[in-house]
Each structure stands twice: as C-alpha cells, then as structure tokens.
Amino acid sequence: MFNASSHSPSEHAAGAQHEPIHMVDLGGLHARLRPELDQAIDQVLAESSFIRGKHVASFEQRLNDSLELGGHVVGCGNGTDALALALRALGVGPEDEVIVPDFSFISTAEVVAEVGATPVFADIDPATFQLDPASAERARSPRTKAVMVVHLFGQCADMDALVPWAEEHGIHLVEDNAQSLGAVWSGPRIQGPAGMLGTMGTTSFFPSKNLGALGDGGAVMTRDADLAARVRRLSNHGAERKYHHLEVGFNSRLDGLQAALLNVKLTHWEDLIARRRAAAARYDALLDDVAFTEVTRPARAAHSTHTFHQYCILLPVGTDRTAIQQTLKDAGIPTAVYYPTPLSSQPAFAESARTVRQGTPVAHDVARRILALPMHTELTEAMQTRVVAELFRLLSST
C-alpha cells in the first residue's frame, strides 16, 4: 500500500525549477485573450449596457449558431438557476419525482428538491460514469415526471437509450450540460448537439467551464419556443413586459458584461476545445508509454464526441488516494476529486430523496477511486509528462 511518509517532499525539490502546473489555468488563458477582453469590458462600460441588452441577445444567438443548436437559448444567472428554470418551466413540483444520477455535482439534485419534487438517485455506467439507462428504468415510478441526464466531464450520456425510453414513458428529459457544451451525439437512433437532444438542456458558464465567464452565468436551451419564452419570463420575475407579471418568477439574468466576455471566448471556441482534446491525447499517449495496467483511463462513449472538461482516471482498488494526492501536491502537481461522495450519501438528502432499490454500487466505487488530473487549455507536454511520471512512480511503489 502506498505510504506518503516514504516519499519526503525533499525528493521533489527539483520540481520547483519547473514551470508551475495548475489544475485550471485561467490566468494563462486570460493573458492570451486580454486585449479582446479589455475591449469588451470598455464597450460595456461605455454603453452602460449591464442588464440584458444587446450583448446578451448577441451572445444567445451566437451560441445557438456557433454550436449549431438549432433552437432557442436563454441566458440566466448561473448553471444551477438554469436547471431550476427548466424544471419550473416544465411544471415539475410537489408530488413529482425526478430521476438523477447519484454521481454528479449537488446542483443536479438540489434544484429538484428546491422545486418541491423528490430526487430519485440512479446508478451510473462503470466505464463512462454517465447515467445508467437500466438503473434509470428501475428508478421509474408512476410519479416520475422528469429525468435529469448529466453529460459528465465532456461527453454525452447514452442518448440512444435514454431519449426513446423517456419518450415512451412520457418523461421530460432535461440535459444538465454544464460540463459538455459542444459535445455531439451521433447514434443510430438519436443525433444532435448535447443540450438539444431532450425536452430541455442547460449549461453553466462558471469560470472554469470550457466556455467560462469571468463570474457566474448560465443558459437554458430548447427547441420549443413556448418553453423558451416561459424560461425567459421566469428568469425576469415572471414578467412578460416591464411591470406586467404573469406568474411568480425570480431574478436570474445573464448580465451584459458577462455576455460580452463570453462573446470573446466564443470567437476562440474551436481553438479552446482543440487544445483540450490535444491535451487529452497527450495524456493517453503518456499513460500508454509507462504501461499503466491498473489505472483506468477515461472511456470514450461510442457515439459521442468529447470536449474534455476533465480528464479523470480510476485508481487501482485499495489505493490510498488521499496519500497519493498529498505527495503529488508536495511535488507541485495538483489533482482533484470529482466527486468524493455520491449524492445519496449527502446529509442534505437524508429526508428529501430516495435511491433506486438496488442501490448505486458503481457510483460509490467510482467516488472512492476517481482522480482528476490537471486539464486546461494552457497545459504543455512537459507539464503532462511530469504529472504522469510522478503518478507512475508513486503507484509503482505500492
């Protein structure tokens, strides 16, 4: 078993001479884009176009066009609000159940409880970590009104299975696409961009996302014009026009400054994704070179492109992940765990959710062993070589 005490930080003193490695390098990205970002900020300041306005409208249309979504995009305050807006627009509320994967960020299930419905946790696929369609079916009940499909880490869940299943049972399919914006599903039955394959889709522009703002932001997307209009109304206090409120909504508007900054990044979208894919390919090659036999690399879904929001490996069973992380940190190599605790084990849901009868053993196993390596647009081959070499050294000593 790996023992952190057998690897003192002094062994890695030479690492301080290397270029720093960041888990996410927003500083490097923004330095490259700084002139364009500054110009966008100056324009918004000069126009005082802070709430909604032309920059938001422009960004919504450009996102729709650039990613060939073929629908309607409504900006909002953040990715969590986007999920809540989608559920509210669909009329999900008390007495309803919403199936969610047990392995995700808390907002996926949090918004279900917020609208008064019951989250029902289903298990995940052991290879892709996406919602397992068979477990989703076992979680279904007469009260099931929606399923929240999370496209995790940069690729799509099994939409060839999930979309027809949801349609067969009259279940709304909401895509939580915070991590996989730009991914495309091309199955024999279902084809299209992530976020536009179900009833509604959502995304997040949190700064570390592949398309990140310099603050919070999110969006809801759908092919249904009426649903889009309701989302826009709900996000603006339920108002159809100023001081005329058709329903009780709340305040969740994408602001003009963030929209202008997102427009800058959208101009560089293809390059940003190409850099992530190149970094993932380098990790693949490096892991092949050192002949890891017990480390599981990220699986690629058969019919999905991958935008690599994260590059997550599975450590061997029994590995002391905490010790591995600490020793890597001492060597100047950051890592992260997405996610350490399945949602069904979170105290927040102790009384407000239920879990599929067969449990979620895969989600619990993955949560114990998953490890995210640095992944961003500024990664170099030298950085990645250090990451893999040090990881191999540590695991080889166990």
Regions found by a protein language model. Give the residues of each.
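PLP-dependent aminotransferase class I/II
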Residues: N3, A13, G27, V56-R62, ...
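Phosphate-binding glycine-rich loop
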Residues: S48-E97, V111-V115, F121-D123, P188
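N-terminal "arm"/small-domain region of PLP-dependent enzymes with the aminotransferase-like
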Residues: M1-S49, K54, A331
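Structural detector of well-ordered beta-strand residues that form the stable sheet scaffold
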Residues: V74, I99, V120, L173-V174, ...
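Active-site PLP attachment segment
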Residues: M196-R232, A239, G256-A259
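Hydrophobic/aromatic ligand-binding patch that stacks against planar heteroaromatic rings
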Residues: V111-V112, W165, P193, N210, ...
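Conserved active-site segment immediately N-terminal to the catalytic lysine
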Residues: E175-G212, K242-L246
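PLP-dependent aminotransferase-like
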Residues: R88-S180, V184
